């Protein structure tokens, strides 16, 4: 909303394919390309409507680096906000996530897990909105968004269903207006030093190896050699 921010808000959406449905066949060839398509779409939307600044909300895998690539390419005042991770499910007194489902599918195929046990796990493993509950691409790049300086501190840690996200949404709007007023642009923030900091965060958190693809792509948009 516009209350307390002072800017004229306009919202636009960008689609992303689900790579989990693309695994094991030709569809997976489209996964990385979708990142670049997202960056292109955000760029065209911003340029086509002559927007002055952007608060970019992204929630799953390729949409995060795609959004950050667009911010750096456009070099406008930019604040990134993560859509948030899913909450864990509970089964037999333990937290379970989609990662447990991955393992269970293998156990089922090996004949070590019954149909009913697999169905029971699948019903409880993903109980809320949000990105996959593991340090996969989405949560890794969410950590990167803070380390790189595009997201507000602690904003990427709030799970998708938490009401604290309302606060971060408003704060992100206020932050982007402050950046606009002071003419602080994305490339003023995304530097070689911030990229190195982001790489350290990926290593320290046991992040996804896909960051090895996405960090150089973000750097490339800023004209920084980061290989």
Task: Label every model-predicted segment.
Residues 3-18:
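Short, small-residue-biased leader/transition segments that mark boundaries at the very start
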Residues 9, 146, 203, 216-221:
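Short glycine/serine- and small hydrophobic-enriched flexible loop segments
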Residues 11, 138-141, 212:
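Short alpha-helical patches at coil-to-helix transitions and adjacent helical residues
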Residues 31-197, 202:
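Active-site cavity-forming subdomains of large catalytic enzyme subunits
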Residues 155-167, 213-227:
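Short alpha-helical "patches" and their helix-cap loops
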Residues 15, 20-35, 210-213, 220, ...:
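Anionic-ligand anchoring segments at beta-strand to alpha-helix junctions in alpha/beta enzyme folds, i.e.
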Residues 63-64, 77-78, 197-198, 208-218, ...:
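Extended, hydrophobic alpha-helical segments in both membrane/secreted and soluble proteins
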Residues 15, 80-83, 216:
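Short internal beta-strands
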């Amino acid at each position: 909303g516009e209350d307390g921010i002072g800017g004229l808000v306009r919202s636009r959406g960008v689609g992303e394919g689900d790579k989990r449905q693309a695994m094991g066949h030709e569809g997976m060839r489209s996964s990385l390309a979708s990142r670049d398509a997202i960056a292109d779409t955000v760029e065209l939307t911003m340029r086509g409507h002559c927007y002055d600044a952007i608060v970019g909300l992204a929630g799953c895998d390729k949409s995060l680096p795609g959004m950050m690539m667009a911010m750096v390419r456009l070099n406008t005042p930019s604040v990134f906000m993560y859509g948030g991770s899913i909450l864990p499910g509970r089964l037999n007194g333990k937290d379970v996530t989609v990662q447990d489902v991955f393992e269970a599918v293998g156990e089922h195929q090996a004949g070590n897990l019954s149909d009913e046990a697999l169905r029971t796990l699948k019903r409880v493993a993903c109980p809320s909105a949000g990105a996959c509950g593991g340090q996969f691409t989405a949560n890794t790049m969410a950590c990167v968004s803070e380390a790189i300086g595009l997201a507000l501190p602690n904003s990427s840690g709030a799970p998708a269903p938490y009401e604290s996200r309302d606060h971060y949404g408003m704060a992100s709007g206020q932050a982007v207006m402050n950046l606009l007023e002071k003419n602080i642009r994305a490339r003023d923030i995304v530097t070689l030093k911030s990229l190195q900091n982001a790489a350290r965060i990926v290593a320290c958190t046991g992040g996804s190896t896909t960051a090895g693809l996405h960090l150089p792509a973000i750097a490339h948009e800023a004209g920084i050699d980061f290989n």
